[in-house]
Each structure stands twice: as C-alpha cells, then as structure tokens.
Amino acid sequence: MWPNGTSLGACFRPVNITLQERRAIASPWFAASFCALGLGSNLLALSVLAGARPGAGPRSSFLALLCGLVLTDFLGLLVTGAIVASQHAALLDWRATDPSCRLCYFMGVAMVFFGLCPLLLGAAMASERFVGITRPFSRPTATSRRAWATVGLVWVAAGALGLLPLLGLGRYSVQYPGSWCFLTLGTQRGDVVFGLIFALLGSASVGLSLLLNTVSVATLCRVYHTREATQRPRDCEVEMMVQLVGIMVVATVCWMPLLVFIMQTLLQTPPVMSFSGQLLRATEHQLLIYLRVATWNQILDPWVYILFRRSVLRRLHPRFSSQLQAVSLRRPPAQAMLSGP
C-alpha cells in the first residue's frame, strides 16, 4: 500500500536511484531540446511533402508511404516526448502521479506502436519498390489510396501487438530512471514471449528491407546500363531508391542495437532480472542508451527525404544531374513527352 492508502499497480519494479542521480541523468533541457528537434524536423518534412507533385503511379504511392512514415514519427515524438519531458522537468515520482499505472500502460503501448511502425513501413516501402522495379508490368497500378491502406494496416498490426500486454501477454513497467515505460525484460514466460515477438518482428522488418533493397538496387543498376534504360525513366526511381536506402540505413543503425540487446537480455542465462523484478544497474544503463539511440530514427527519417531529393542532390553533386539528363535524353521522344519535366 502507498502511504495515502492507494495500492500500487503492477507496473512498478524496484529501481534504486537517488534524486541527485536522477537529476544528473534526466535533464529536462535535453529531453525538451530532443523533442523539439524531432518535431521541427518532421514538420519541415511534412511541409516539403505537402508541396511535392506526386503525379501518378509509383511516385504517388511512394510519397504516400513516406508521408505515413513521417506522420508516424511526428506523432510518436509528440506523444512519448511530452510524457518524458514533463517527468524530467518536474522530477515527479511515477508512483505518486500514476499509482494505477494507466499512464504507464498508455506509454508502453505508444512505445511499442511508434517503435514498430517505422520498421514495418520501411519494409512495406521496400516491398513496393522491389515489385515496381523488378516486375513493373506484372502488378496493378500503384495508387496513393492503396499506399494509405497499407499504412493503415501497419498501424493496426502495430497497435494490436502493443495491446498484448494489456491482454495478459507480457508486462509494461516503469524503467530507469523512472521517467518512461517499456516492455519488461523479465523472466516470466509472458515477458519473454512478448519481448521476443517485438524484437524478432522488428529485426525481420529490417532484414526484409535490406534484402529487397539490395535486389532492387542491383536490378536498377543493371537496367540503367542496358537497352531497357531507353524504355523506362530512371531518374525518379533512382531518387526513390536513394531515399529508401537512406531510411533503411538509419533504421538499421538506430534500432538493431536495441533489438539485439532485448533478445540477448531475455535469453541470457542466468537471468538478468532478479526474482524481485530488479535489473542490474549496468543493464538499466544499457537499455536507456539503446533506447535513446533508437529514438534518433524519428529525427533522422525526415532529413533523409529532405536532403536526398533530386533538387538537393543536383546542387550538391552536379554529376548526378548530368547523369539524370543523360538518361532523359536516352528515352524515346514519345515517352519523353509523356513523362513531362
């Protein structure tokens, strides 16, 4: 029982941390600046996307998926960042402000949802480009409506997975230094199963993106230097693949350390978590660091699109512009007229 007579929820674990240590780790300025940088970056990307001319076909589908990714990153930073920044600024004791764990459960669901969505959307974008490049004439015409339907399916799938701990599979708990909630790296079967589902699904999404993007880039390079280059405009596809590879690299660098750490911790023998639910301080520090690295994915994603557009690449690398012009000159006259500027 808590001193005011309120019983504590199941999201609390023993976490030994002093107020001075928490002040040193949980800097309100760092949290606020980090959140503001991410929100500003995603708002800038959304404004650029709003002014883009999607046209029709593969580009409209790709831009719709990209818009869904940036929108998801923006909402993720807005929801989770607001909770963490407020906890850091006020140095609140989670047990006093949320003894029933409702806010903790909400944040846990949000962390899983907004963590998996970018990885799943990256895999969906890689699949769309793989089919578009390797089999351009053997699929239905890509449309932005179908792309938004894909975004909706990803949101539903990630949301359903995030709700599993509320249905009894796994647990969400307050994490060191007491300002955020995430899945529990415990020894209970439900914790292990849910944690492995999250880590394996995220890793599989990254692996699928790597495989499909590698094949797509190889196919694009082969077609670029063959007769087929005179039959299909390559400049737009090159731009989309450069952006997609950048998104994949960012996701791999930011998320794989955390996903691998979760799997290693859950499968480690002897278990890292004690019977009382306490983690080793070194493990808590590592989890916090890997989580902060993973959060950079939401900040860097929009900059991949902003910096890797054709207009920017032409300014930074004139040779890229000359290569695109050479490809355009190699198109048949009728196709060049239909393709437009």
UniProtKB/Swiss-Prot annotation:
Main location: membrane
Disulfide bond annotation, renumbered to this chain: C104-C181
Keyword Membrane in annotation: yes
Single GO BP term: cellular response to lipopolysaccharide
Topological domains, Extracellular: 1-29, 87-105, 171-191, 269-287
Cytoplasmic side: 53-65, 128-147, 218-244, 310-341
Modification Phosphoserine, positions: S328
One term under GO cellular component: plasma membrane
Keywords: Cell membrane, Disulfide bond, G-protein coupled receptor, Glycoprotein, Membrane, Phosphoprotein, Receptor, Transducer, Transmembrane, Transmembrane helix
Family: Belongs to the G-protein coupled receptor 1 family.
Function summary: Receptor for thromboxane A2 (TXA2), a potent stimulator of platelet aggregation. The activity of this receptor is mediated by a G-protein that activates a phosphatidylinositol-calcium second messenger system. In the kidney, the binding of TXA2 to glomerular TP receptors causes intense vasoconstriction. Activates phospholipase C and adenylyl cyclase.
Name the record gives this protein: Thromboxane A2 receptor
